[in-house]
Every structure is written in C-alpha cells, then in structure tokens.
C-alpha cells in the first residue's frame, strides 16, 4: 500500500513479481464506501518510511517468523533505495522485535537474526559507526513476580539510551 500511495499507477501484480513472491491475490472489488476508506488509509501511508514499520513476534520461538519478516523488510528497504548492507542494520535496529518465555528459544532467535543480517552484509558483525548490531529479541521468564521497582536494576550493562528504551518497553509489557 505504501508504494501505491506514492504512485497510484503501480501495478500490484508487477510488484509481487519483482519481489519474487510466489503467491499473489489481486485486491478484490469493494463497495464504493470501502474504496473511499481505503484511499484515505493509503494517503496516510504516503509519508511512511521503512524505519517506521514495527514488526513484533510475541512468541518468537527460534525466530522463523522474524527471519521471514527480515526478508520482506529487505525487499521494502531495497525498493526504496537502501543498499542491502545498510538495510540489514536498519532492520535490526528499527523493525524487528521478538519475545519468548524460553531462554533457549531466545538464543536461537538471536542467532537466526544475526546470521540473517550477516547473510546480507559480510561486515554485519563488526557493526556500524562502532555500534554493534543488537537484535531486539528478549527472553521474558515470567512477570508475575516482577516488581516495577526491579526495573531500575535492568540493563546496567547497556548504553543509557538503549536501557531507557528497553525499560519503557518492559514497563509497557508489565
């Protein structure tokens, strides 16, 4: 919808073929009132940047959905002019988030996201501007016994900005 908002002459089927999507269903005909509402929604997408897209898998397991999201996001980023190298960092930094209650699943998901980034950028592990990539995937054991006052102890080894963001996200989840 974002590409269509930028250029109404865009052909959905051609976009699907360009992205290499195997399955495509054209948009079904709608009532006029629905078309009006869709046009309104699409106009809101006109200024959408790829970094504004938030994808979260609340039960990420070993990260299969995160990796599928990574590929779709890579198509979006490259279609808007990003190189695959730069897009790999942007996706990990801005788009993909995952949670799981199993520590081992978290480790597998973290590994999967890091390897996917490495697949698109040979220098991915080195980081960008001296900042190492840090996938936003987390293991949440159980929150029944977590007190909000304990959040002040959370993330002491993280840089201040990342710690504050993580604490805000944790407060929201609690």
Task: Describe the role of every protein-language-model region.
Residues 1-174:
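SAM-dependent methyltransferase catalytic region
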């Amino acid at each position: 919808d974002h590409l269509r908002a930028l250029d109404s002459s865009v052909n959905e089927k051609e976009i699907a073929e360009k992205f290499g999507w195997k399955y495509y269903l054209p948009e079904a005909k709608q009532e006029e009132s629905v078309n009006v509402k869709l046009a309104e929604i699409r106009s809101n997408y006109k200024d959408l940047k790829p970094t504004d897209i938030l994808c979260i898998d609340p039960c990420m397991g070993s990260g299969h959905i995160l990796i599928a999201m990574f590929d779709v996001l890579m198509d979006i980023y490259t279609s808007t002019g990003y190189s695959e190298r730069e897009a790999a960092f942007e996706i990990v930094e801005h788009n993909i988030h995952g949670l799981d209650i199993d520590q081992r699943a978290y480790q597998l998901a973290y590994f999967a996201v890091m390897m996917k980034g490495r697949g698109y950028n040979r220098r991915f592990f080195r980081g960008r501007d001296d900042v190492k990539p840090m996938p936003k995937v987390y293991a949440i054991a159980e929150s029944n016994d977590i007190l909000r006052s304990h959040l002040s102890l959370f993330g002491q080894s993280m840089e201040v900005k990342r710690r504050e963001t993580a604490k805000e996200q944790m407060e929201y989840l609690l």
